[in-house]
Amino acid sequence: MNIYIDENIPYARDFFTGHGNLHFFSGRNASAEQLIDADVLLVRSITEVNEKLLSLNKKLKFVGTATIGTDHIDQTYLKNRGIVFSSAPGCNKVSVAEYILSSLLVLADQQQFILSDKSIAIVGAGNTGTAVYQRLNALGMNCKLYDPPLLLAGDKRQFCTFEEVLEADIISLHVPKVVQGPFPTVHMFDSKVLSQLTNGQILLNAARGDLIDNQALLELAEQGLTPTLVLDVWENEPHINQQLLPYVAIATPHIAGYSLDGRVRGTEMLYQALCDFLQLKGKYTTADFVHRAAINSVSISKKIDQPLIKSLMHLIFDVRRDDALFREMIEDVDGFDTMRKTYQERRELSTLTVESSVEQNTLLQLLGFSTNVQNEIKETHEI
């Protein structure tokens, strides 16, 4: 059995060795000729899996994507050919939520505001949007959810209108790319919508680049008419409009979901799905391969406030590191993909155990940290 695997799916060799002949390929440059003898195809979001890519292959049985999003997969075509498909829903929701949290803590420090004084509209209330909501709600923010498809499907949570989205202090996008249907998301934020936003607002996009009309955004930015921008995703990746970069407060190359834990979680989900398809019992889990974080415990004696949360957060992940590196690497023609391919290891907050009082542990847990009651950890860093 020939298993073709995107070369940037982490720990794939460890998980899949023994299940067939492993062939690793560049996901950005996959071709029909290259995949002609694949029985299993494992990809990421950069590979469009459709009739064109699979036109020469007559034996493919299983396609998997190590991502939450599936808009790069022609599922109708796969179904018509009898090819089993699997994705990794929720695999990197924590990673994206922590990217948003780090970004907002940085901006709050720079602009001198308290997050609990702000309202945030979370556009998209699926796995990732919900993870963002849980963390920011724990910080006391006025969180609003906008998701018409979920509302129509009977979701019992309270949802806001799009008008209310545009009135929020902060807007964070977490919807898939939808081209057609009653609720398309491509250019959801077009020139008309963007022109309704103000300099006092913050707009974050860690979902899909096509949600925002980047050219319209640039034209407004050149006039000084945009909110503070945090962009992890861009139109026309990897060949983004670099003229937009100077106007973006925090800019990164589609790495919000790139924590080691989240990426390996996606690999494990594909591994388990393939084992189920082959009617085999899986032997491995993420814990078999991922080591402890370099900084894995800390003790705090002070009362938790926003600066302390920022300090704890940035022991694990500080988005400013990625922003600075991206602005440097994007000067190279292949810089966007190079940074993603060589992305420095980043862990999730759960890998850090915070020793604190019982009273403070609930908030820490809601933010994603592991916790222990004071004095239960012997070897810790102290803040």
From Swiss-Prot:
E.C. no = 1.1.1.290
Q: Tell me where it resides.
A: Cytoplasm
Catalyzes what? 4-phospho-D-erythronate + NAD(+) = (R)-3-hydroxy-2-oxo-4-phosphooxybutanoate + NADH + H(+)
Q: Name one GO biological process term.
A: 'de novo' pyridoxal 5'-phosphate biosynthetic process
Taxonomy, superkingdom: Bacteria
Q: Name one GO molecular function term.
A: protein dimerization activity
Residues of the active site are 208, 237, 254
A GO cellular component annotation in the UniProt record: cytosol
Positions annotated to bind substrate: 45, 67, 258
Q: Does the keyword Oxidoreductase apply?
A: yes
Keywords, A to Z? Answer: Cytoplasm, NAD, Oxidoreductase, Pyridoxine biosynthesis
Q: In which pathway does it act?
A: Cofactor biosynthesis; pyridoxine 5'-phosphate biosynthesis; pyridoxine 5'-phosphate from D-erythrose 4-phosphate: step 2/5
Task: Name the Gene3D superfamilies on file.
Answer: 3.30.1370.170, NAD(P)-binding Rossmann-like Domain
Tell me the residue numbers annotated for binding NAD(+): 147, 232, 257
Which proteins does it associate with, and in what oligomeric form?
Homodimer.
Q: Which family does it belong to?
A: Belongs to the D-isomer specific 2-hydroxyacid dehydrogenase family. PdxB subfamily.
Record function comment: Catalyzes the oxidation of erythronate-4-phosphate to 3-hydroxy-2-oxo-4-phosphonooxybutanoate.
Under which name does UniProt file this protein? Erythronate-4-phosphate dehydrogenase
Name the gene behind this protein: pdxB
